[in-house]
């Protein structure tokens, strides 16, 4: 039995207790398993009818919910937050939630049911700008409810780049342009001490979403092109705001035309500035450091998450930036 199947069975067994906890407002639940969802939560579609209304609202039910995801969702989009601000939250609105169910220490949430996720093949400039604006609002709101920190443990960039060199040298997987990779990684290795010092000393001023890609950016309605919401908070971490911008950018390395000229780093910087957030000094240089470090890890991770087009784009970044940052 898979983890998804076991949590599905648990959810079905606890459904009567869940509906009782919701005091009759929660309707029948249609449980389903999505291939893209992170973690082992069961997800169900239902309707919510408030005690003072006869108009049902489409909702999504999730259980069990991990501590971090529960805390962020309820803090940023719970009823208390909604009363404190007239602005639409950057996450799905939380309708009901609790950390106990049926006598078990088991967290669950009921949230508004959103429209479709952004479709990469159908993205517009407006979609991308709206997506980065909701990321900026997440940064602002998260910092308001919890101080940012602590500083994360440094990543083993040297170990990953060394593994990349071995993958290319020993041809552990087939990656095109191996000679160019050899040369780019050789130059990168010489720069690593400076690059890692620079990156590890970056300001830690933001709660980063950590997983900003189209499947985690949802429309609030089927035809809503501006009011978006983020989902999947399993990778939220303290870091630099540029990490979210570059994570989204990297999803398009293999097909940059799909960005329609939108530059995620600069667009997120403008959105944050409009909200009064400090972007720091010389973030463009820090972004290049991050791009080069990540590009140098692509061969090491190729077997699990690579593609020829992505590797080609990463090589282009590596060759450009080893010269620029030398």
What label would you give each PLM region?
Residues 97-98, 118-183, 203-205, 237-238:
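A cross-family kinase active-site recognition segment
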Residues 77, 139-143, 249, 253:
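Protein kinase-like catalytic domain
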Residues 1-33:
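Juxta-kinase regulatory segment immediately upstream of eukaryotic protein kinase catalytic domains
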Residues 36-50, 193-243:
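Active-site acidic catalytic loop and adjacent metal/ATP-binding pocket
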Residues 57-106, 120-137:
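A conserved alpha-helical element in kinase catalytic cores
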Residues 242-277, 291-320:
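Active-site activation/catalytic loop segments of kinase-like enzymes and analogous catalytic loops
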Residues 108-116:
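Short pocket-lining segment of the protein kinase catalytic domain that shapes the ATP-binding cleft
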């Amino acid at each position: 039995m898979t983890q998804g199947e076991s949590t599905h069975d648990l959810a079905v067994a606890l459904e009567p207790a869940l509906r009782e906890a919701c005091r009759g407002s929660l309707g029948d639940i249609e449980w389903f398993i999505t291939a893209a969802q992170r973690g082992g939560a069961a997800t169900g579609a239902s309707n919510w009818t408030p005690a003072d209304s006869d108009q049902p609202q489409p909702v999504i039910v999730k259980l069990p919910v991990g501590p971090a995801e529960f805390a962020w969702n309820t803090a940023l989009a719970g009823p208390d937050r909604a009363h404190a601000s007239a602005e639409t939250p950057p996450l799905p609105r939380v309708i009901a939630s609790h950390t106990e169910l049926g006598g078990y220490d088991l967290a669950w949430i009921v949230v508004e049911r959103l429209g479709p996720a952004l479709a990469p093949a159908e993205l517009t400039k407006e979609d991308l700008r709206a997506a980065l604006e909701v990321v900026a609002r997440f940064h602002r709101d998260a910092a308001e409810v919890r101080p940012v920190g602590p500083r994360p443990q440094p990543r083993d960039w040297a170990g990953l780049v060394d593994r990349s060199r071995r993958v290319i040298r020993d041809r552990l997987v087939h990656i095109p342009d191996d000679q160019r990779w050899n040369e780019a990684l050789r130059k990168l290795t010489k720069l690593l001490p400076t690059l890692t010092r620079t990156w590890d000393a970056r300001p830690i001023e933001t709660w980063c979403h950590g997983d900003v890609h189209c499947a985690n950016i949802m429309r609030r309605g089927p035809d809503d092109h501006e009011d978006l919401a983020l989902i999947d908070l399993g990778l939220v971490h303290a870091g630099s705001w540029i990490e979210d911008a570059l994570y989204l950018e990297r999803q398009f390395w293999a097909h940059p035309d799909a960005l329609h000229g939108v530059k995620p780093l600069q667009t997120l910087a403008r959105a944050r500035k409009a909200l009064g957030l400090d972007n720091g000094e010389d973030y463009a240089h820090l972004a290049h450091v991050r791009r080069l470090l990540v590009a140098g890890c692509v061969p090491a991770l190729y077997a699990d998450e690579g593609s020829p087009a992505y590797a080609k784009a990463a090589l282009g970044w590596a060759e450009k930036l080893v010269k620029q940052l030398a």
